[in-house]
Amino acid sequence: MSSKHFVITVERQYGSGGRLTSERLAKELGIHFYDEEILKMTSETSAIGEQYFRLADEKAGNNLLYRIVTNIKPELSEPAQNGHKITSPENLFRFQSSVIRKLAASENCIIVGRCGNYVLQDQLDNVIRIFVYADTVTRVRRIMDVDKVDEAEALRRMKRIDRTRTEYHRYFTGRNWMDMENYDLPINASRIDYDQMIVLIKDYMRLRGFLE
């Protein structure tokens, strides 16, 4: 591995295999993989109960329609440390973003979801922004396999979770979650497996000078 510092952010459609691929890639690279672990770390840092972060995890705040109409987004300023706004969705997002930035500054790692590509937008020389997607047939099949549900339930979960992630990304970034201009490496996982996705990502890392 090169000595060049890097962070990989991964956004993923539900059922695309993005999370599993990221976890396997982290093991191969010998670096940390952060997904729900960020919730616990943020809770410990902020002294706010983890349940608040879990309830708000990758979900839009209460003013989604207003934000869509006015095209505004919360500022990535320092979070409030006290007062009635301390557990607002915007403030919880600021706490979480602060943890993500600290992780990115201190180690090579993979960060899944939570608008990592947006939170680290000022560090793009050291960030690889990945978006993993796939066709409906592939995703439904993977959801059935991993979640052990029937086809109808898999389709419902896919639509519901994708809608939630889309709204979350729009609410906190003002951006279209699936706008590929916001990513360095979009990956269509419809016709390749997890191992092949890892090969593809590693090849891109070599092109960027992060792997020898």
Predicted regions and their residues:
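Pre-Walker A (Motif I) flank of P-loop NTPase domains
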Residues: 3-8, 107
